[in-house]
């Protein structure tokens, strides 16, 4: 399955590949043939990047799940920071069930998403009102990622694990954890959106 909104990108890449392939044959040009192979490789990369595999999500109000694929690069108090590498799936999912109370988009720079200065980067924040209080899911663009996509709207009722948006080409997602939960992931741990449990309800 391909991510929602990927069609224009893939159509353009496929069209360019086909165009250079036809031109290289028509003009018998080895140079254009090489360009066609490069375009084909880029198209393959785009398909790999925009993949969005189906995942069976076990919905529960006793734990929170990761909103993104990637690696936990920092835990700051009640906030977990997850860095998504280029090879990761870049579709983001709701860590908890609730209602989207607010969505705030801010323009900004494009510093590496793992840097502290990336707090000034382009970002999109979801405030999900859950039974345990508000949960913030912050999408942060990186040096390559320059387009944040939102699949959800204010007042949408969302289920844990539901797709809420994506960031193109490498980025970071921060999620806040309510005080009713205990954070169980550690810095350096790899996580999967909709699958990895990142916090459990306190007993």
From Swiss-Prot:
Site description Cleavage (non-hydrolytic), residues in chain: 170-171
Annotated cofactor note: Binds 1 pyruvoyl group covalently per subunit.
Keyword entries, A-Z: Cell membrane, Decarboxylase, Lipid biosynthesis, Lipid metabolism, Lyase, Membrane, Phospholipid biosynthesis, Phospholipid metabolism, Pyruvate, Zymogen
The protein's Enzyme Commission number: 4.1.1.-
SS bond partners: none
Topology class, membrane: Peripheral membrane protein
Primary enzyme class: lyase
An individual GO BP term: phospholipid biosynthetic process
Subcellular location: Cell membrane
Required cofactor(s): pyruvate
Post-translational modification: Is synthesized initially as an inactive proenzyme. Formation of the active enzyme involves a self-maturation process in which the active site pyruvoyl group is generated from an internal serine residue via an autocatalytic post-translational modification. Two non-identical subunits are generated from the proenzyme in this reaction, and the pyruvate is formed at the N-terminus of the alpha chain, which is derived from the carboxyl end of the proenzyme.
Entries under PANTHER family matching the protein: ARCHAETIDYLSERINE DECARBOXYLASE PROENZYME-RELATED
Role played: Catalyzes the formation of archaetidylethanolamine (PtdEtn) from archaetidylserine (PtdSer).
Subunit structure, as described in the record: Heterodimer of a large membrane-associated beta subunit and a small pyruvoyl-containing alpha subunit.
Similarity comment text for this entry: Belongs to the phosphatidylserine decarboxylase family. PSD-A subfamily.
Name of the protein in its database record: Putative archaetidylserine decarboxylase proenzyme
Gene this chain is encoded by: asd
């Amino acid at each position: 399955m391909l991510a929602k909104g990927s069609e224009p990108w893939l159509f353009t890449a496929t069209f360019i590949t086909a165009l250079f392939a036809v031109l290289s044959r028509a003009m018998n040009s080895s140079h254009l043939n090489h360009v066609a192979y490069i375009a084909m490789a880029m198209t393959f990369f785009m398909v790999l990047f925009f993949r969005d595999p189906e995942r069976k999500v076990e919905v529960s109000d006793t734990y929170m799940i990761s909103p993104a694929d990637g690696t936990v690069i920092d835990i700051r108090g009640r906030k977990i920071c997850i860095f998504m590498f280029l090879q990761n799936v870049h579709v983001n999912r709701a860590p908890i069930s609730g209602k989207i109370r607010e969505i705030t988009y801010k323009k900004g720079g494009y510093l590496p998403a793992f840097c502290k200065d990336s707090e000034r980067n382009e970002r999109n924040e979801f405030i999900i009102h859950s039974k345990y209080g508000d949960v913030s899911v912050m999408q942060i663009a990186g040096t390559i990622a320059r387009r944040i996509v939102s699949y959800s709207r204010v007042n949408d009722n969302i289920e844990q694990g539901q797709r809420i948006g994506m960031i193109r080409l490498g980025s970071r997602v921060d999620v806040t954890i309510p005080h009713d939960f205990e954070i169980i992931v550690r810095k350096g741990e790899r996580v999967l959106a909709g699958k990895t449990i990142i916090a459990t309800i306190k007993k």
